[in-house]
C-alpha cells in the first residue's frame, strides 16, 4: 500500500470519527479513482480544475432559489432594506475578493497547498468546517503577504 492510499485511508477514518460525510465522500471518490487505475489520468484533471468545478456547484446551489421562483426581484429589493442584508452583501464582495487572491497564490506558490489542505482537513474533520478553506485561506495568506511586502 502506497503512502497516498494510506494517507487517504487515515483521512477517511478521521472523517468517519468526526461524522463528516463530505470528507468521507471526497476521500472515497479519490480512493476509487486511484484503486481502479484511473489516478494518472483523472487526478491531475481534478487537481487542476476541481476548485473551479466546486465553485460552479456552489454557485448553482446558491442560484437554485432564483430558478425555483423562491427568490425574485421583490425579495431582493425587500432584503436590501435591512442592515443585515447590506452586511451580507459587503461580506460576499469581501470574500469573493479574498478568494481571488487565493487563486492567485495557489497558482503562483503551489507549495502553500499542503499547509492549506492540512488546515482545511483539521477544520473539516474536527470542527465540522466546510472545505472552502484552501481558497479562502490562500486568499487571506495572500493579503497578509502583500501587507508584509508593503512594509
Swiss-Prot record:
SS bond list: none
Subcellular localization: Cell membrane
Species this protein is from: Geobacillus sp. (strain WCH70)
Family under the similarity heading: Belongs to the UPF0756 family.
InterPro entries tied to this protein: UPF0756_TM
Name assigned to this protein: UPF0756 membrane protein GWCH70_2680
Transmembrane annotation, as ranges: 5-25, 53-73, 86-106, 116-136
Cellular compartments per GO CC: plasma membrane
Keyword terms, alphabetized: Cell membrane, Membrane, Transmembrane, Transmembrane helix
Organism lineage string: Bacteria, Bacillati, Bacillota, Bacilli, Bacillales
HAMAP family documented for this protein: UPF0756 (MF_01874)
Pfam families, per database record: DUF441 (PF04284)
Topology versus the membrane: Multi-pass membrane protein
Chief location category: membrane
Highest taxon listed in the record's lineage: Bacteria
Amino acid at each position: 500500500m502506497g503512502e497516498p492510499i494510506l494517507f487517504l485511508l487515515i483521512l477517511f477514518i478521521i472523517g468517519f470519527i468526526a461524522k463528516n460525510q463530505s470528507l468521507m465522500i471526497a476521500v472515497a471518490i479519490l480512493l476509487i479513482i486511484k484503486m481502479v487505475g484511473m489516478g494518472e489520468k483523472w487526478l491531475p484533471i481534478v487537481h487542476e480544475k476541481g476548485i473551479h468545478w466546486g465553485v460552479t456547484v456552489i454557485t448553482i446551489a446558491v442560484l437554485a432559489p432564483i430558478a425555483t421562483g423562491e427568490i425574485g426581484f421583490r425579495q431582493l429589493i425587500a432584503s436590501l432594506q435591512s442592515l443585515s442584508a447590506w452586511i451580507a452583501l459587503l461580506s460576499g464582495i469581501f470574500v469573493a475578493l479574498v478568494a481571488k487572491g487565493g487563486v492567485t497564490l495557489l497558482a503562483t506558490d503551489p507549495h502553500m497547498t499542503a499547509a492549506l489542505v492540512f488546515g482545511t482537513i483539521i477544520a473539516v474533520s474536527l470542527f465540522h468546517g466546510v472545505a472552502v478553506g484552501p481558497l479562502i485561506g490562500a486568499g487571506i495568506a495572500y493579503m497578509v503577504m502583500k501587507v508584509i511586502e508593503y512594509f
